[in-house]
Amino acid sequence: MRVTEVIGIVPAAGKGKRLAPYPLPKEMLPVGYQIIEVNGQSQKRPKVVSQYLIEALAIAGVSRIFIVIGPGKFDIVEYYRNGEDYGIPIAYIFQPEAKGMPYALDLVTPWLKGCETVLMGMPDTIFEPRDAFQRLLSAHQAWEADLTLGLFKTNFPQKFGMIGLDQEYNVIEHIDKPQTTHLKWLWGIACWGPRFMVLMHEVLKALSSTSAERKGREVIFGDIIDAALNAGLRVKGLPFEEGHYIDIGTYEDLKQAILLYI
């Protein structure tokens, strides 16, 4: 696969209703700590949850990051600023109305040349291994895939998009938040190339031109995964057997993350 520019996209425009009321965006909740230099001395300081994602993107070597924000999310801009502290240029795109993650991702399209490779993760999640994006990118390039999903085990399939693979790591099944299922892998992070980006844009364009846009249901990334499978795109899954994935979207999950990273 021809090497292209690798960028990161962080969708952070959601309202975080499950943790409301809270005076800060959920992406800015403190989980764990970081070591910083203060007057020549190393000191511990709180670490916000979205910083784990930014650092994982940095490990993968992305050249720039786009963070899509919405109303009430300007604390994110104030915290990360231009990305200088992380060695990566960070730009922000404003989404006035949260319509679903795919729409947030598609807002980045006008700012791209159309040949980039994208790494994407959710800023209210923490996952291991730390180099998961780096390994996902390597697999994506080796497989010459259109979309490659990073997969993690879970005992709570009803909270995630669940993925089935064949022996060649091809994605052959996707079910969103099933109450019961034989599937054991959730998709947590993603890597894609130009063909998938074009497909997502065309799917959203088609939905917007009809009055039956999911009959009021929010369009989710899983809808685009399904569209890619139906279109015959090369969709792969990379399982992280020893990894873990925490979505801090509820109080219990936030408590688990705080205890794990204290």
Locate the predicted segments by residue.
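N-terminal glycine-rich phosphate-binding loop and ensuing alpha1 helix
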Residues: 2-76
